[in-house]
């Protein structure tokens, strides 16, 4: 149903007129929201930024279930949403962001820094590892303050990672693995931050 689909589009100075020309092809309600982020080290932080502003302007959606996902996916079939309306947050399974993945980088400072930014303890992550997920979310009641913290934590985590990257590489190399083989999926920052908040 077109009225149930809300597409959030960010813009900096003004909306490109081409968007208006092509709105008739869009299968949903388009909301143009100005990108007023003060920090943009982590470009995907635009997502929580747009969502927090949308929720502030549309508080009626706090009592609605929302299916949030990126625009670059295609569904063969939609999930059975009715079976998911149980007050919990549902996520797609994404083992590439679970606790074991982070620990596999052999960097005690890395995991400590990541959890400290969000304010969660490692024991909670380990206990809930089987529930790790992201990329697509089904939730209710996550408003402005939640998404504002997610936006701020994304920027802190991403920037903090690069500020201490050499330390993480040193710890990785100290475990006997070639320092040049170090890699870490920091692009998933927002997935950790949403999950851990």
Language-model regions, residue ranges each:
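Glycosyltransferase catalytic domains, chiefly GT-A lineage
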Residues: 1-197
